[in-house]
Amino acid sequence: LDIYITSPDLTSVVVNGSGDFKGQGKIDSDNLSLTVLGSGDISLYDVICDNLYAKMNGSGDVEIKQLRCSAAKYELVGSGDISVRQDRVRATDISLKGSGDFKGYLQDCGKVKCNLVGSGDIRLSGTAVSLEKSKIGSGTINAAQLRVNR
């Protein structure tokens, strides 16, 4: 079953269960909140916003192919995955608890903060002004492909 929705301003997407949400056009919003609870997926093509908050709790996936915003906060709990390509985001906060994976390509971004607890992996590439990271558990924070311009 496919449902098509048109909205002048998208502020929140919640996928609860096994459903999927796919944004096919440009999304321009002040504040955008993305939440997956369960095994569902959110896939967005082009997002422009002031603040992005993405929360994954379960085994689903969140993918953002192009993101431009002032601040982005990602919270991943469980075995799900988040993949994002960011452009000129001033502040990025990544929190991963569990066995999930975060993959981020950061183009000309500002401060990046990573907190990993568990066996998951955070992989970062691109360029950023600063990187702060903390890790507890067997997971890895791989920033070998991230050029940090302090």
Predicted features and spans:
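N-terminal beta-strand/beta-hairpin edge segment
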Residues: L1-D2
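Short "repeat-start/strand-capping" segments in structured domains, especially the N-termini
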Residues: I5-V13, Q24-L34, Y45-A54, K65-Y74, ...
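Periodic glycine anchor positions in long extracellular repeat architectures
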Residues: G17-G19, G38-G40, G58-G60, G78-G80, ...
